Amino acid sequence: MPKPDIHPTWYPDAKVICNGEVVMTTGATQPEIHVDVWSGNHPFFTGTQKILDTEGRVDRFMKKYGMGTKKKGADSAKAESKA
């Protein structure tokens, strides 16, 4: 038997609300739960996700910070000047 007056009120039919629309009911300690995203409007679950061009972003970073591949002409010119 649980101790009296220490447990929250249980709502077996709590409404989950997204954008002003009831999307599902569940059990919770609050009568209404307001959410911004749920599986019905999340891009991953709806199949409308945008695929980023990660290769282009990496190349842009490498060029910006000088971590890209070195030119062969520059290496041979340095070697000739040292000799």
UniProtKB/Swiss-Prot annotation:
Gene Ontology MF annotations: rRNA binding; structural constituent of ribosome
Record keywords: Ribonucleoprotein, Ribosomal protein, RNA-binding, rRNA-binding
Record GO biological process: translation
InterPro entries: Ribosomal_bL28/bL31-like_sf (IPR034704), Ribosomal_bL31 (IPR002150), Ribosomal_bL31_A (IPR027491), Ribosomal_bL31_sf (IPR042105)
Family designation: Belongs to the bacterial ribosomal protein bL31 family. Type A subfamily.
Function field: Binds the 23S rRNA.
PANTHER family given in the database record: 50S RIBOSOMAL PROTEIN L31, CHLOROPLASTIC, LARGE RIBOSOMAL SUBUNIT PROTEIN BL31C
Binding partners and assembly: Part of the 50S ribosomal subunit.
Protein name: Large ribosomal subunit protein bL31
Species name: Synechococcus sp. (strain CC9605)
Record lineage: Bacteria, Bacillati, Cyanobacteriota, Cyanophyceae, Synechococcales
